[in-house]
């Protein structure tokens, strides 16, 4: 899509807000991920696109379903090559603070693709998702969120939304089925996600979490 225009716009905005880091909500390489750490897409779709001075900050990354069509281990391994790209594991966490304030933020990055029940029936996903361990990830999420206390913001980042006003309603239902109770029990403040190719802010009644969807920025 229009990645060059998006990269230029992000650089213009970053000159004003001077971000300390940037978050990707997955589908990092459209349409089929990357093949290896030497895939030319690293250059053509990342390094040469997001090259502005103010974009030379850590990029905190999560995986999307299109990344699963390629080599997800290569995206993890690229963390050892790039000083910006940060994806140490399919699911991971990061503690941040806002400069010159007492505000602390806990980010929990999760891998939502294995929680999409219908992917286990689709040829382009079933072989790779069947090798994942959703129980292990759920256990990790429970333990991780359970340890969070005395922070100003408890934020989770994933790819698939739980709620949407868009067309991917079925996908959202699977995410909600597997994860919403964990968010409720652990008072997650915000869930950043993508998948839908638009921007949405949803706050379901009787739930604490604000859902912020930002997917396919180059299309928006």
Task: Describe the predicted segments one by one.
Residues 1-40, 165:
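N-terminal active-site segment of His-dependent metallophosphoesterases
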Residues 30-153, 168-190, 196-220:
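Extended active-site neighborhood of metal-dependent phosphoesterases/phosphodiesterases
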């Amino acid at each position: 899509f229009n990645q060059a225009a998006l990269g230029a716009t992000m650089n213009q905005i970053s000159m004003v807000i001077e971000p300390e880091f940037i978050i990707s909500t997955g589908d990092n390489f459209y349409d089929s991920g990357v093949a290896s750490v030497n895939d030319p897409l690293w250059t053509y779709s990342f390094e040469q696109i997001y090259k502005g001075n103010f974009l030379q900050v850590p990029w905190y990354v999560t995986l999307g379903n299109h990344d699963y069509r390629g080599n997800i281990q290569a995206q993890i391994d690229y963390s050892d090559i790039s000083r910006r790209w940060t994806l140490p594991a399919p699911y991971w966490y990061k503690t941040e603070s806002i400069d010159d304030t007492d505000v602390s933020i806990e980010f929990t990055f999760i891998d939502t693709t294995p929680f999409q029940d219908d992917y286990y029936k689709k040829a382009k996903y079933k072989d790779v998702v069947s090798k994942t361990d959703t129980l292990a990830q759920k256990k990790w999420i429970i333990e991780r969120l359970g340890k969070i206390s005395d922070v100003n913001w408890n934020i989770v980042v994933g790819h698939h939304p739980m709620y949407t006003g868009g067309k991917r309603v079925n996908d959202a239902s699977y995410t909600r089925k597997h994860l919403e109770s964990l968010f409720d029990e652990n008072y997650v403040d915000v869930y950043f996600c993508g998948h839908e190719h638009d921007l949405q802010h949803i706050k379901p009644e009787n739930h604490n979490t604000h859902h912020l969807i930002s997917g396919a920025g180059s299309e928006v």
